[in-house]
Amino acid sequence: MSAPDAHPGPVPTADWAPAATPAGELRLVPVRPERDLAMISRWMNDPVVAAFWELAGDEDVTARHLAPQLGGGSHSTPCLGVLSGTPMSYWELYRADLDRLARHYPARPHDMGVHLLIGEGRHRGRGTGTTLLRAVTDLVLDHLPLCTRVVAEPDVRNVPSVSAFLSAGYRFSTEIELPEKRAALMIRDRAHRTRP
């Protein structure tokens, strides 16, 4: 995979150095549909992913999901997680305080949010999600000094996801009712980081 590309979203991932993790070197690479659409669509059609993302279908379904994030003025940046040179996860880093999510919890200015899916089944169930969540959250907090916390809202039925967030240093705040799911509001505070 070549060097990261410029992107339209609010998160400056293009100049973020890769993160060293126990699973390998992780780099966030902004999504480019011409390069990434087929792979992301394939991941969205994996039954485990489709059960919670609800974006199964042809590539047009995935393209329609990505389009608003790739347009100017978006508060969300879609990225591939490239682990030791292999694209293996999909991320959405977003300003939670500007998102519809802010209507469902006491948002603070500059709250960031994270969505994650592990693309290939061989990477699931081995603690990789926890490792990647910890690394990406640290990247966000390292590069966005006004952000005091990172939030997530996995479906409460997605026990492996909730567990990964907890193991990555997030705390369970409350359950919230969103239009598409009942979610576990997970929060990782800057003040509770395990490293400087």
Regions found by a protein language model. Give the residues of each.
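Helix-loop element at the rim of GNAT/NAT acetyltransferase active sites that forms part
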Residues: 42-56
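Conserved acetyl-CoA-binding loop-helix of GNAT-fold acetyltransferases
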Residues: 125-141, 163, 167
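C-terminal "cap" of GNAT-fold acetyltransferases
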Residues: 110, 178-196
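Conserved beta-strand-loop-alpha-helix junction that forms the acyl-donor binding cleft
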Residues: 150-162, 179
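Acetyl-CoA-dependent GNAT
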Residues: 68-113, 117-121
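An amphipathic alpha-helix signature
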Residues: 34-41, 63, 67
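Conserved N-terminal entry element of GNAT/NAT acetyltransferase domains
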Residues: 1-34, 194-196
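Conserved acetyl-CoA-binding loop of GNAT-fold acetyltransferases
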Residues: 164-176
